[in-house]
Amino acid sequence: MAHILLLTPQLPYPPQQGTSLRNFHLLRALAHRHTVTLLSFAESDRAADTARLAELARVLPPVAVPDRTTGQRLRVLLTSRMPDMARRLHSEAFAAALAEALRSEAFDAVQIEGIELAWTIPLIRVTSSSTRIVLDCHNAETELQRRALRRDLRRPGRWPAAIYSAAQVGRLARFEREALRTADAVITVSEIDRRQLMALADPAQPMTVIPNVVAVADYHWEGDVPDEARFDLVFTGKMDYRPNIDGVLWFAGEIWPLVRRARPATTWAIVGQRPHARLMSLGNEPGITLTGRVAQVQPYLAGAGVYILPLRIGSGTRLKLIESMAAGCAVVSTTLGAEGFALENGREVILADTPEAFAAAVLALLDDPARRLALGERARAFAAQYDWRRVGPLLDGVYDGLLAGR
């Protein structure tokens, strides 16, 4: 048994969408074998909910997310060699809380969730030199930024975003390389990410794939689906996240008109917290609902005719895909949206990469309930391998190797 300090960019409860979902289930798996202390940021738009977390770990007082103005971000962009991501959660209050925790207790290891918190590595080294550091990379961030740059360069209206990405790629590569090479062990979410990150890491760097997971049973919806959660099409995710914004706008601009032309009564729910300003007008379009934050995504998945995943940029693996498959949804995705999974096109998911092919796949499923059901059943069977209980042995392997002989 080890004593582990877990650092997360937000409180991992409730486990809803993306980072918090992964972090909660990693915490559950760690707590089965180890003693865990949790230090997190707390988001200003949601109440701190630590009761469930306290059953798994000692929860230190969460730290407020730093408030960075557009002007501050612009100054970093223009004057710093550091990537924007490295400054996003840079906080003197968090640094002080971390240093105090390291001085107060003897930790065998600190597990850092995401590259946004990699700025803490030098502080950990100075404060507690014998403590091992595990860096969990939720994405291959340099590759993600390269993909965004390539995508935006092809669209004149997105050239300001392309300029941002161009400035970030080199900085991110340096920062990511340094973080990888100074950690004692690295975790990635997929073999694809592992290969991309190994191009930056020391060749001898221990790097383990621990996939994204969910509590699969939580997605087997037993009750009635409320009418307000029933839609022909559903997309879920954090709606201030650049890959999600891009995917929704692409679907809305190029695919949705084709679907509505063929089936004028089709409905679409965009389910997720903090809709970006670029998305707000979609809520005024006929047939489209922007829900904002919801208590649970499961009713919307259970009530979906088809789950859509129109992503064109990103890295890692999509937790939203695991969630939708675990719920038994019929899924239409881009190839990139399903990246990192050994899926067979037409068996567990339908892949489509052009507006015409995507719209045709969606329409075919909406018109064929039996096919939707069969596709969803195969998807649910596939998702069973991504239950959170399966990551425990993988985490054990990381820590057994890291702490051997201590």
Residue ranges and their predicted role:
Residues 349-356, 364-369:
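Conserved acidic donor-binding segment of nucleotide-sugar-dependent glycosyltransferases
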Residues 184, 287, 299-316, 327-330:
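Acidic donor-binding loop of glycosyltransferase active sites
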Residues 371-385, 394-397:
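A short, well-ordered alpha-helix in the C-terminal region of glycosyltransferases
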Residues 9, 70-84, 133-174:
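Acceptor-binding helix/loop patch of EC 2.4 sugar-transfer enzymes
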Residues 1-62, 103-105:
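N-terminal subdomain of nucleotide-sugar transferases
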Residues 142, 165-221:
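Donor nucleotide-sugar binding/catalytic pocket of nucleotide-sugar-dependent glycosyltransferases
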